[in-house]
From Swiss-Prot:
GO biological process terms, semicolon-separated: translation
GO MF terms held by the record: structural constituent of ribosome
Protein name from the UniProt record: Large ribosomal subunit protein bL33
Any one GO cellular component localisation term in the record: ribosome
InterPro entries documented for this protein: Ribosomal_bL33, Ribosomal_bL33_CS, Ribosomal_bL33_sf, Ribosomal_zn-bd
Taxonomic source organism: Gloeothece citriformis (strain PCC 7424) (Cyanothece sp. (strain PCC 7424))
UniProt family annotation: Belongs to the bacterial ribosomal protein bL33 family.
Keywords assigned: Ribonucleoprotein, Ribosomal protein
Length: 64
């Protein structure tokens, strides 16, 4: 018998300013992993997190 997938998904959050900002502290793109509830949050997740490459708090969006 196969079990159903859970409601929670593991997602990746990526900094939105790292791609377009040439004046950042170091090369690369900041990424965080977290989980979200598929039933409660159906859309893409956006959180303000600290970006180590930009050296400030920026908006991180969910990528697939």
């Amino acid at each position: 018998m196969a079990s159903k997938k859970g409601v929670r998904l593991i997602i990746t959050l990526e900094c939105t300013e790292c791609r377009s900002n040439p004046d950042k502290r170091s090369a690369g793109v900041s990424r965080y992993t977290t989980s979200k509830n598929r039933r409660n949050t159906t859309g893409r997740l956006e959180l303000k997190k600290f970006c180590t490459h930009c050296n400030k708090h920026t908006v991180h969006k969910e990528i697939k």
